[in-house]
Amino acid sequence: MRIIRDIGHVKRQRRLARWAAFFGFLLLVGTFPLVFLWGSQPNLVLASYVLLFSGFILFNFGMQQIGKWSNTPRHPRADLALDAKLKALPDKYILVHYARIGKKVVEHLLIHPGGILVITTRDYIGKAVARRNRWRKAGLGLTRLFGMSGPQLGNPSLETDQAIAAIEQALAEAKLEVDVDGAIVFLNPAVQLDVDDPDYAVMLLDHLEGYVRSLEPQTPMSAAEREALVALLGKGEELEQPQTMPTRRPVKVKRRVPERVRGDGRAV
């Protein structure tokens, strides 16, 4: 499988996440001096609440983004987790991360023999309930409050709709006819899914490779068509060199055991 990644987008999002968390923290700390002045200057009460609310929102947003764009052995970044799970696919599959299409960045898309699959990922841990294109978190209000700085659910169906629309517009402008579909993939196996009649396939990360292999094309894509899609969709601010993931296991070479020689010169 070939991989194209806009590492420049990753670096920029990391910087934005750190700055958001930093300035959010400063706003939160800035409320304390105003609190001590409340008694002498009551008009500062409103300013204190504005700083507190703004700092809380900005700090939690920054922490969410830091978690999203960090990469550790226990918590791989979304694009790297997809790479690891789909690495056994042959070279006719091309995984593009953070493709800049017009004004929108499509985080993950897979060019496969039958077309293009938009992969919308979520690292959400709790219980996710979906009815067609409507998503909500199930849980107590206090649990939601403490989870504000962690991975969020949002509406992955809407995000997939927007990504598909951007890709279809780019294909139309380039006069390319390719089927585009979407899949919603949850990265954390601890998530609880309650899904009924979703607009797109919803699955855990472990099931993604099997789903991709099941997408049998009516007319397989030619190499020229595939490269035209790569030229159109594989754009970004700082692209990594295209990588090819190995699809075969290395062949183990058996070593010969050295022969032992007896005292009369004959091999044992």
Could you say what each language-model-derived stretch is?
Residues 1-104, 111-112, 116, 125-130, ...:
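Surface-exposed interaction regions that form or flank ligand-binding interfaces
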